[in-house]
Each structure stands twice: as C-alpha cells, then as structure tokens.
Curated annotation (Swiss-Prot):
PROSITE patterns assigned: BHLH
Lineage per the UniProt record: Eukaryota, Viridiplantae, Streptophyta, Embryophyta, Tracheophyta
Main location: nucleus
Quaternary structure and interacting proteins, as annotated: Homodimer.
Domain of life: Eukaryota
Record's protein name: Transcription factor bHLH139
Gene coding for it: BHLH139
UniProt keywords, alphabetically: DNA-binding, Nucleus, Transcription, Transcription regulation
Compartmental location: Nucleus
bHLH domain span: 138-187
Amino acid sequence: MENEAFVDGELESLLGMFNFDQCSSNESSFCNAPNETDVFSSDDFFPFGTILQSNYAAVLDGSNHQTNRNVDSRQDLLKPRKKQKLSSESNLVTEPKTAWRDGQSLSSYNSSDDEKALGLVSNTSKSLKRKAKANRGIASDPQSLYARKRRERINDRLKTLQSLVPNGTKVDISTMLEDAVHYVKFLQLQIKLLSSEDLWMYAPLAHNGLNMGLHHNLLSRLI
C-alpha cells in the first residue's frame, strides 16, 4: 500500500512537471512566435482610418455643396434687397415728378414759383435800369440842371424871407408868403405916413393896428 501511494505521488509529480514544461514550452513558443501585432495592424481590427478616408471626400463634397447652397441663399436674399434699393431710388427720382400739393403737382408748383420769382427779378432790374437811365438823362440835360439851380435859389430866398417876416419860421411856406405880402404893404404905409407932414403921427397907430386892418383905412386916406 505504501509503495502504491508512493508511485501515485511520483506520477502526480511527474505529470505536474510535464505540464509545467509544456506550459513553459508553450510560453517560449508563444514568446518566440512572431508578434501578430506586427503582422496585423490596428486598421484590421478597427478600420476607422479607411472609413474616414472613404468618407472624407463625401464629407468634403457635402460641405462644399452646403457652402454653395448658403452662398446661393445669401445671393437670393441680397437680390431682393438690391431690387428694393433700386426701386426706392427710382421712387425718389420719380416722386418729385408725381408728387402733388393742394391739387397741383409740385413740379408745376415749383416751376410757377420760379417763373414768378424770375419775373419779379426781371421787372425790378428793368425798373432800376430805367430809373438809372432817367437819372442820367436828367443829370445830363441842361434844362434840368438850370431848373435844379433855380429851385435851389428859390429855397434860399424863401429862407431869407422867413427870417425877415415876423413869425415866418413858425408857419408853413404858404402862410408865410401871405404874411410877407401884408408886411410889405405895412412897410409901404409906414413910409408914406412918416414922409407925410400931416399924418406922420399915425405911424405908431398903423404899426399897432396892423392886425386890426387900420392900415387899410390909412392907405385909403393917403390915396
């Protein structure tokens, strides 16, 4: 019995050693075997690169198509805006022609105002030219020069007469001339009274009665 147990133990130990050697040989063979990673690439197990390479062109085509669509859409959006701008500019150009104000077009209204203003300017310029010509004609006419000098002399005489006639500067020209006539008659009466031997004493009375009309009576007596 003891021999059989010993034999069995030896067999088990031999089997264990055999298994160990086989495992070690398998490990050495596994270690000495060429590396499968060197033979098989990662792309064989996970072909993401090929997928990306195959789809890259499609992605680029899609992106280009999308960008073209975006550009086309932007151009389509810009075209109506350009049309709107052109239409607004055309409206601005045509509005002054078609605008109305108080039942009358602004163009005709403005044109009529301009014509009126031009007419007024032309009329004023013509009137000024006529006045200038008239003034030049009057200044160059010898008769007008003589008449002007005569008026100046008359004005000087009137001023002198106003200073001689009593209260002549306090009244107008016509009243002053009437007073001047009466004053001259009174002076004539005074001269006659003073030159008469019989009536010289009436001279002060004639002077004081100038405003009462006594000088008329004295003149009638002298005549």
